[in-house]
Amino acid sequence: MTSLAGPGSTRRMALAGASVLLVALGLVVLMVVRPSEASPSGGASASQSAPAEGSVDAGFARDMAIHHQQAVEMSFIVRDRTDDEDVRRLAYDIINTQANQRGMMLGWLEMWGLPKSSAGPPMEWMGHTVEPSDDGSLMPGMATDAELEALEAAKGEQAEVLFLRLMTVHHRAGADMAQAAAGAAGTDAIRNLAAGMVRGQKSEMGLMADMLKARGAKP
């Protein structure tokens, strides 16, 4: 699989990956013991049968886990390249929210006894497939390797504007994916999580539009 991280980010991604793994393992335990507290809806409880490997639920969880991984990576990058408190606060919010959501989705896949990756192409669960391109962009909205390298190299306002533009595109595609899952998933857990993602990412898109405008830039 093409790397999602640019040069110099191996240590950061290792730390982020370890944190997400701990969250995922913890959520598996919580969902077995107290399912109503481990998800937005309690829909991952034993009262609902586990979705099939080729289901919308499993496909969305796998693809969005990858999508979220890059959002977390970009947020770590910009956090270290600006002193602007508003941008850093947004980056922290994205890191915390999307790392936790990613952990939930990986935890559900674990609980359902399903693999966390698929041999097929991304987006099959939406009724169409996307072949990963040579530029490193694995799914709609994801930044290319060159864009990640540019973000790594930028500093100050240049980094802020590039991050806000890349994350706006990332959120727009993520919200489209989540909207599809909210309407087609078979489990309450995925439907409710996806609906929450739509609301959260659309709200952040509005915030990022205002932040770009304040910097004299367009999305």
Predicted regions and their residues:
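All-alpha RGS (Regulator of G-protein Signaling) helical domain and cognate RGS-like helical scaffolds
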Residues: 4-219
